[in-house]
Design a protein with these regions (language model features):
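A short glycine-rich, hydrophobically flanked beta-strand micro-motif that places a catalytic Asp/Glu
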Residues: 76, 199-216
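A structural signal for short, well-ordered beta-strand segments and their strand-loop junctions
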Residues: 111, 206-210, 223
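A short mid-domain helix/strand-loop element embedded in enzyme catalytic domains
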Residues: 144-178
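Conserved beta-strand/loop block within the catalytic cores
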Residues: 17-21, 210, 218
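Active-site loop/lid in soluble adenylation, ligation, and acyl-transfer enzymes
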Residues: 2-156, 272-308
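A long amphipathic alpha-helix within ATP-dependent nucleotide-binding catalytic cores
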Residues: 176-207
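C-lobe/activation-segment region of protein kinase-like
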Residues: 242-285, 300
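Catalytic activation segment of kinase domains across protein kinase-like and atypical kinase folds
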Residues: 211-257
Length: 308
């Protein structure tokens, strides 16, 4: 497969792990690199094959969403770690977005949680979220418990730091009507239901993940970016979960490494005090191999396809 970026595409912008190229007025190309980041810090280590696994996983899920009848911005893969997608306008000024705006990125992230994990567990522990809000009939819940009622949160997408939003503000800044907002929630529920069934075949539990959307030129909802990858979502091993073990099978594995080394505490202390942030150390060679193997293994378990 040849890449438009080799000839006609102009470099547009670079994220922590993804490069974006302008191909035409209506197309952009994503290049998924082998870089890896945690806590908004790019680790100075490359993970072999990581970019390819994420691109192929993202393609897999976008096609699954299309099978359910939903629109996506996906057009085609142009290389092992690249995909061509429809271009939408990115509007940073919320005042310029309204109910009539078309062909734009909805400036929201939707985080769908099926189990108590990550930051949700932290907020429950600190009393910031009442378990009753999640459908629990008790005051205390343990890490790893299945949430009785699917919990979908919304945060900002285009601000320097993602900020949690109540529904009223989410509607205000996104130009969405209440009906469109509810349509997004229903779309997420349907897609996540299929995701859970598919990954269960690979012995996985889909714990949580985020999704992004845009409106096309007819102002019809479509999936933007990728979802369901080992970077975007959290997965646990089903057999081990049934034995009471929540084994991280996604980028969380790398986060846990830096938590154990004490780096996360050091970093967040510096951020709270407004001090210079410490550089994130490189991963040791044995960890790089483990992480690369993890991404390949996750690709095969998520999609049911052989990597090679």
């Amino acid at each position: 497969m040849s890449s438009p970026s080799n000839t006609s595409a102009g470099f547009s912008r670079e994220g922590k792990v993804k490069r974006v190229y302008d191909v035409s007025d209506k197309e952009i190309e994503f290049e998924f690199t082998d870089r890896i980041s945690v806590f908004d810090k790019i680790i100075p280590s490359k993970i072999p094959f990581k970019g390819e696994t994420l691109c192929r996983e993202g393609t897999f899920w976008l096609k699954e969403a299309e099978k359910l009848g939903f629109l996506t911005h996906f057009m085609k893969m142009t290389d092992k770690n690249k995909m061509l997608v429809k271009k939408v306008n990115i509007i940073h000024d919320y005042s310029k977005i309204n109910h009539n705006t078309k062909n734009y990125l909805i400036p929201l992230e939707f985080i769908c949680r099926h189990y108590v994990a990550g930051s949700l567990h932290d907020r429950i522990e600190k009393g910031k979220i009442d378990p009753k809000e999640l459908g629990f009939g008790k005051k205390t819940v343990a890490y790893g418990e299945k949430i009785p009622e699917l919990f979908i949160e919304t945060s900002t997408k285009l601000e320097p730091v993602d900020r949690p939003l109540e529904k009223k503000e989410a509607l205000s800044i996104s130009g969405l009507t209440e009906e469109e907002y509810n349509n997004i929630l229903e779309t997420i529920i349907k897609v996540d239901s299929k995701m859970s069934k598919i990954v269960e075949k690979g012995g996985l539990i889909h714990v949580d993940g985020k999704k992004e959307f845009g409106m096309n030129e007819e102002r019809t909802l479509m999936f933007i970016d990728v979802f369901g990858t080992a970077d975007e979502d959290r997965f646990w091993d089903k057999k081990l979960y049934e034995q009471g073990q929540m084994v991280e099978l996604s980028k969380e594995f790398v986060r846990q490494y830096y938590i154990k080394t004490g780096y996360k505490t050091e970093l967040y202390d510096a951020r709270e005090k407004g001090q210079p942030e410490p550089d994130i150390p490189a991963l040791p060679e044995n960890m790089i191999k483990q992480v690369s193997d993890l991404y390949i293994n996750m690709y095969e378990r998520i999609t049911g396809e052989k990597f090679r």
